[in-house]
UniProtKB/Swiss-Prot annotation:
<feature type="binding site">
    <location>
        <begin position="395"/>
        <end position="396"/>
    </location>
    <ligand>
        <name>substrate</name>
    </ligand>
</feature>
<keyword id="KW-0926">Vacuole</keyword>
<dbReference type="GO" id="GO:0005773">
    <property type="term" value="C:vacuole"/>
</dbReference>
<dbReference type="GO" id="GO:0006508">
    <property type="term" value="P:proteolysis"/>
</dbReference>
<feature type="binding site">
    <location>
        <begin position="262"/>
        <end position="265"/>
    </location>
    <ligand>
        <name>substrate</name>
    </ligand>
</feature>
<keyword id="KW-0961">Cell wall biogenesis/degradation</keyword>
<keyword id="KW-0964">Secreted</keyword>
<keyword id="KW-0732">Signal</keyword>
<comment type="similarity">
    <text>Belongs to the peptidase M14 family.</text>
</comment>
<feature type="binding site">
    <location>
        <position position="262"/>
    </location>
    <ligand>
        <name>Zn(2+)</name>
    </ligand>
</feature>
<feature type="binding site">
    <location>
        <position position="265"/>
    </location>
    <ligand>
        <name>Zn(2+)</name>
    </ligand>
</feature>
<dbReference type="GO" id="GO:0005576">
    <property type="term" value="C:extracellular region"/>
</dbReference>
<protein>
    <recommendedName>
        <fullName>Inactive metallocarboxypeptidase ecm14</fullName>
    </recommendedName>
</protein>
<feature type="glycosylation site" description="N-linked (GlcNAc...) asparagine">
    <location>
        <position position="378"/>
    </location>
</feature>
<dbReference type="GO" id="GO:0008270">
    <property type="term" value="F:zinc ion binding"/>
</dbReference>
<feature type="propeptide">
    <location>
        <begin position="21"/>
        <end position="171"/>
    </location>
</feature>
<dbReference type="GO" id="GO:0071555">
    <property type="term" value="P:cell wall organization"/>
</dbReference>
Length: 621
């Protein structure tokens, strides 16, 4: 009854909200918005209209009084200051709770309560469910649960605003030193790769960086687009290949690696970047990597959801879906991992576009999913490609999932091979960092209503998967025999807000996955390569991705190039080295003047450094 009343109030209130949304017939990409401007503004209520409506429903129906503003201690932040007002206003009372489940009835009760209250389910397994909600909603949630669940929870994140703030890049880069136009002679210059992966990077930095890699390594790297987003942004990718594809040689075996389907899962985007950078820079030096690029085309797509990814940097760090308009214009967005055409089951969420799992009103309504599918089909039908593997990186829970996602009653015909390779991938990850990744079918953990066939309007995806997934589509439609969805770090301590120091270790884990996958596919023809010795090995403490960047050089660089400008022509035969620095204004004053530094820091507002700085790439002779 409460659920029906909630929906009734929602429909009545939606009319007023819809009329308040400006109409527009043409969708054009918006110019980049500096987060510092957003954070420094003082909106009367920065919550999205849907969130305001949801909170009003809860307060009205369950009689919850609006709590006083939550107070954050200034010393809690690693930056020694509280989050900016915009973050506090949006997330100030939000927490993440983990509920422990003991049986199906408890899972079903929690599913129903989360559905009624429109809660954001972060992750779920047959043993636990992580839910994000406002503190003031906790009494309402507990009131809808059986007694056994009312004490079966623990707080995972009790200061969500603070945790969100720490995921954005710090104001100052790490390890940058020296004067403008010169590399330091006292120690090696900062390593290009390490510097880039010290922080999460916005799309405005990632795309110029990809262009630079394509220009630096034209022999085996080419920048391509696999489609256009709903707001008109290109979906960028790098094609890594050192082989040739002709009709005489037969179809070119192709492996696709994607990230960022869900916008808030930044670690997926950063991991794709790290893996492709490692493959690019190790080509010609590593026998294993050289063999991989000779035998396969690698399509590396950092994010298939550029609109959503940009939105997480500019407005809402925890945005999940794309930014496509829906039937409820104040609830935009389609879940791109439920929008694919194979066994699409979007009827379950069709009535609620505000759901984080909303799959659209029909298969492939999600623009970016449609674009990637069309590109993949065109590759196989017209460009002599044979897509043999698909790796889809998500977060979180440290799990390797194989098809099928839509149903456990359907057994994939290559199940034995999928399980064998999946266990091998998990072993390769342990080799890199000693982290444990579980291996299971993507369907396991799906919890539906006990009479799902008679009540198709509701479901609770414990494992985060269902019909319409990219995993199932690539496996079934284009016959990518070895298709996996890999949920990256961690197991819940940080959730979607994984600290940036995990970027490089996670990248090493998936690099090992790529090596293991390649060696498995090449099989008996790879005796000339010692694959195991090429893996990242924690016991060896490999701190360098490429030893060439550890050489010191006391000569001033003769070439400067701004990453956001046009790329130069580079002679691939020249043996040059590159380092990355930040463009800054330097003076002859002592840079170590502590008094000046302290005074400057007091005057500065909190900013997101990565969206304000400009990278330069310096060529060393």
């Amino acid at each position: 009854m409460r659920h029906l009343l909630s929906l009734l109030v929602l429909l009545i209130a939606s009319a007023a909200l819809v009329s308040a949304v400006p109409a527009g017939s043409i969708i054009t990409p918006q110019p980049p918005v500096e987060p510092v401007h957003l954070l420094s503004s003082q909106p009367s209520d920065p919550r999205r209209p849907w969130i305001r409506l949801r909170d009003w429903i809860i307060e009205s129906i369950w009689g919850i009084e609006k709590p006083a503003s939550r107070r954050f201690p200034l010393n809690d932040s690693p930056r020694n200051r509280s989050p900016p007002s915009r973050i506090l206003a949006r997330y100030g009372s939000d927490v993440v709770l983990r509920f422990s489940l003991r049986n199906h009835d408890e899972a079903e009760a929690l599913a129903q309560a989360a559905d009624i209250l429109f809660l954001d389910v972060w992750a779920s397994t047959p043993a636990f469910v992580d839910i994000r909600l406002a503190e003031e909603v906790i009494p309402s949630l507990l009131g809808l649960l059986p007694n056994s669940l009312q004490t079966a929870y623990t707080p995972l994140i009790d200061n969500l605003a603070e945790r969100i703030y720490t995921t954005y890049p710090s104001k100052k880069p790490i390890g940058l030193e020296g004067q403008s136009g010169f590399a330091s002679s006292s120690r090696p210059a900062p390593k290009f790769g390490d510097l880039f992966f010290h922080e999460y990077q916005p799309l405005s930095v990632i795309i110029p960086w990809m262009r630079l890699l394509a220009s630096m390594f034209p022999s085996h790297v080419r920048m391509i687009s696999v489609g256009v987003s709903y707001e008109g942004r290109e979906i960028p990718a790098l094609r890594l290949s050192a082989g040739s594809s002709t009709a005489a040689s037969g179809p070119r075996k192709t492996i696709i690696v994607t990230g960022g389907s869900h916008a808030r899962e930044w670690i997926g985007t950063s991991t794709v970047n790290h893996v492709m950078y490692t493959l690019i820079t190790k080509y010609g030096k590593s026998k294993a990597v050289t063999r991989l690029l000779q035998d396969f085309d690698w399509i590396m797509i950092p994010t298939i959801n550029p609109d959503g990814y940009v939105y997480t940097w500019e407005t809402d760090r925890l945005w999940r879906k794309n930014r496509q308009r829906t039937s409820l214009r104040f609830c935009p967005g389609i879940d791109l991992d439920r929008a694919w055409g194979f066994e699409w089951d979007g009827g379950r969420t069709r009535a609620n576009p505000c759901s984080e799992n909303y799959a659209g009103d029909e298969p492939f309504e999600g623009m970016e999913a449609q674009q990637l599918a069309q590109w993949a089909l065109n590759e196989t039908q017209n460009n002599n490609a044979d897509i043999v593997s698909f790796l889809d990186l998500h977060s979180y829970s440290q799990t390797i999932l194989y098809p099928f996602s839509y149903s456990c009653s359907s057994i994939p015909p290559t199940l034995e091979s999928l399980e064998e390779l999946g266990l091998g991938l998990a072993k390769a990850i342990r080799y890199a960092t000693h982290e444990i990744y579980d291996v299971t079918s993507a369907c396991e953990g799906i919890v539906t209503a006990s009479a799902a066939d008679n009540n198709p309007g509701r479901f609770f995806p414990i494992g985060g998967n269902s019909g319409g997934s990219a995993l199932d589509w690539f496996y079934h439609q284009v016959h990518a025999t070895y298709s996996y969805q890999i949920k990256l770090r961690d197991r819940g301590s940080y959730g979607f807000l994984l600290p940036s120091e995990h970027i490089i270790p996670t990248g090493k884990e998936i690099y090992n996955v790529v090596l293991k996958l390649g060696s498995f596919l090449i099989g008996g023809d790879s005796f000339d390569v010692d694959w195991e010795s090429e893996l990242f090995d924690l016991s060896k403490d490999e701190s360098d991705l490429d030893s060439r960047y550890s050489k010191s050089n006391d000569r001033s660089p003769a070439y400067l190039h701004n990453a956001n400008g046009p790329l130069p022509n580079i002679d691939e035969d020249e043996d040059k080295e590159w380092v990355m620095v930040e463009e800054e204004d330097y003076t002859d004053d002592d840079d170590d003047d502590d008094d000046d530094d302290e005074e400057e820091e007091e005057e500065e507002e909190d900013t997101y450094w990565a969206t304000e700085h400009t990278y330069e790439f310096r060529r060393r002779r």
